[in-house]
Amino acid sequence: FKGVVAASYGRIYFKNLIGRRTSESTALNFIANGEGYLGQHTLATLMFALSSYEPPAEVMESYHVPAEGRITESAEGEEKVHLYSYRTPDYVMGSVLDYHPGEPGSQEHVLQVMIKDCDTQIWINHPGEAVYFGEGRPGYFAGNGTLPLIRQDKNCAVAEFHLLDQEVQYTHAFCPLEQFSEWRLEGRWLFLKKDNICAAVYADNGIWITDKGPLKNYELVSPGKDNVWKILVEEESVYGSFEKFIHKLHQNGGKER
């Protein structure tokens, strides 16, 4: 999406999640398609740039997304892990479905949303440690202490958590509010707008925006061992306005799908 990987990962680090422009894969995308960023990782980038290799036509075609969006599903690895992604020209939502829910996690990145660019992103996880920028595997934002059950249908995803007896007894979302042109917290809902795209984040146990420290306006916290998060992304034109988007979700109780 826009030249960066925006999907579930089997192994992730916080520095990679927030530093999308620095990954080697984005430089490869830049050379192949003109989208992405050139960084300081040069091994594969240099070999690709100097070689005569040209990606197959089907790979190049995958860069182009129709206006109505595209669903991509695959089974990866020895366990045939079910990866699901829905991508439009303006946003992408990707997840791993039914991956060991309720079991201890590691560095799996299980749910990811990007809107318009690689800086406007949202993901939900259970912190594997209480230290913000520690060395734990899983960490505070990278990976999950307890893995959730995830379901996704195109632009809507649900993450159901039942936490084990671990250090952190809440779940949270990374959500940089400064990247959005408008946002509004109403009850258990956080509504957001970025240009022509609307998004809604919901948690059964309520949402609190971290209002101090290094994560001020970057973190959404929801308490409790048992919790359900929902996230929906849609074009504003589908509803007519941001206000109508909010009204519709309140009216339907979030049951858009």
Task: Show where each model-derived region lies.
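Ser/Thr/Asn(+Pro)-rich, low-complexity disordered segments
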Residues: 2-257
